[in-house]
Every structure is written in C-alpha cells, then in structure tokens.
Design a protein with these regions (language model features):
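Central antiparallel beta-sheet cores of small beta-barrel/beta-sandwich binding domains
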Residues: 24-156
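Bacterial N-terminal signal peptides that target proteins for export
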Residues: 1-9
Length: 156
C-alpha cells in the first residue's frame, strides 16, 4: 500500500509540473501594437495640407521601451520636415489618442479609432485603417479641427 501511495504522489507531482509548463501565461497579455506610418487619405483641409505623415512608435526596444522613449511624431512636408514629437499615446483596444509637443507655439491633438490592428500583417498599404479628429493648436487654443481618414503607409 505504501508503494502505491508513493507512486501516486510521484504521478500527481509529475502531472502538476507538466500542466504548469504547458499552461499559457495569463499574467502578461500581449501588448497592442498600433505602430506604423499613416498619411491623410484624400485631400485634407488647408490647415492640415502640410502634414506629410503621422508616425506611431511601437511598444518595443526601438519605440516606447527605448531610452529615451520614441512615441512617434507628426511630420510636416516643409523643407525642414518639422517633427512634432508625440507624448505617450493612450491606446485602449482600437482607440488611440495623443498630443504632441509644441514647436513654435503650434501643437496637435488626435482622437481616433483603428478599423483593425493587423494592418501590417494583412499588408493593408494605402488603405484607410485609422479615422479620427485631428486638432491644430496655437498657444494651446484650437485653430483648426477636422475629421480625417488615414492610410497605412509601410516604411513611411
């Protein structure tokens, strides 16, 4: 009887260990990846006509985890290619919002929604994947606001 109990205890311990190894970890859910380069779809209103792209950094060692962190930028199409660096965006599911640092008293704010977050895997280049409201601010006051669609543009 003692031998049966020892064998049973060993089998139980082995089974518990194999379940612990095989079970997926639920303590670290995968982070949402909304990184990419996005350009305004169609002809934008005059106040936003000089925006070349919006770049959103990834949650990796080259983006949010870099030192210092890279969250992205709003880049103008002027000769200097002025970048308005993003503060850390807020991402909740498919929703994103961000603000930029001011350059010469001008800054931008955005609130929008991704149609899906697998646009890179599905190679959805030049397709609308993000819609939202972009605001241009001067000295902290809104000077222009528009509902815009953005295409995914691989490689910027």
């Amino acid at each position: 009887m003692r031998k049966i109990l020892i064998n049973f205890a060993a089998l139980l311990a082995l089974t518990s260990m194999s379940l612990a190894v095989a079970a997926p970890s639920l303590t670290h859910p995968s982070a949402v990846d909304a990184s990419g380069t996005f350009s305004i779809h169609g002809t934008p209103p005059q106040a936003f006509a000089n925006i070349a792209v919006i770049e959103i950094g990834g949650n990796d060692e080259y983006g949010w985890k870099a030192t210092p962190p890279f969250y992205g930028f709003v880049r103008l199409s002027n000769k200097a290619q002025t970048d308005y660096k993003l503060f850390k965006p807020t991402i909740d599911g498919n929703n994103i919002s961000f603000k930029t640092r001011a350059v010469g008293g001008i800054s931008y704010e955005f609130e929008g929604t991704f149609s899906s977050l697998d646009f890179a895997e599905k190679d959805m280049r030049n397709q609308v994947v993000l819609k939202g409201t972009l605001k241009k601010l001067a000295a902290g006051k809104v000077t222009a606001e528009a509902k815009l669609d953005f295409d995914y543009t691989p490689g910027g």
